[in-house]
């Protein structure tokens, strides 16, 4: 199932309009640190920055049968410490059931097996219960909480829940996750 139909591929310039339309959806913006509507110019500048030598990130499009469904971002990549931060979202509301689980599995496999990272770090706004459960379901462990870390116009200050996932955890849990995904197919 995972080998042939689902994949992460590098984000390309041709993806920018689609990714911008996803990123500007209210449901996605509300889960981000910055929730303003992003202009095409701002989005293009961001993408140009990601293409520069020395940029510390990687950005992927998550696809099913070559059809884009979402985005996975790796930022603050430290080769020295073998650590990165991740972010993600499904942009297609009609994505098949289980798509988010496959996306998470592929992202973790990319980080730990292809990029040889030791740790993946996630940060989730306290009011994003779906993402909090998602991180736990994938095997992330809560490592801390940044109190009143982000200000949102409607909610005021929000805590940020910090998650970590170590490569040794991945080695223990990846087959369990893969088996669960195979059962969904």
Show where each model-derived region lies:
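Conserved GNAT-fold acetyl-CoA-binding loop/helix
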Residues: 27-47
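Alpha-helix C-capping/helix-to-loop hinge sites
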Residues: 29-31, 50, 93, 149
């Amino acid at each position: 199932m995972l080998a042939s139909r689902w994949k992460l591929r590098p984000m390309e310039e041709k993806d920018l309009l689609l990714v911008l339309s996803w990123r500007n959806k209210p449901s996605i913006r509300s889960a981000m640190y910055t929730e303003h509507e992003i202009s095409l110019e701002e989005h293009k500048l961001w993408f140009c920055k990601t293409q520069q030598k020395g940029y510390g990130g990687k950005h992927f499009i998550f696809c099913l049968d070559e059809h884009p469904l979402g985005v996975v971002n790796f930022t603050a990549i430290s080769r020295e410490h073998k650590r990165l931060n991740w972010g993600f979202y499904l942009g297609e509301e009609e994505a098949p059931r289980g798509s988010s689980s496959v996306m998470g599995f592929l992202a973790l496999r990319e980080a730990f097996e292809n990029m040889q990272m030791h740790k993946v770090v996630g940060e989730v706004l306290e009011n994003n219960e779906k993402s909090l459960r998602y991180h736990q379901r994938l095997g992330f462990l809560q490592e801390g909480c940044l109190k009143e870390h982000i200000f949102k116009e409607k909610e005021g200050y929000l805590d940020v829940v910090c998650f970590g996932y170590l490569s040794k955890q991945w080695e223990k849990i990846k087959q369990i996750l893969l088996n669960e995904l195979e059962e969904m197919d």
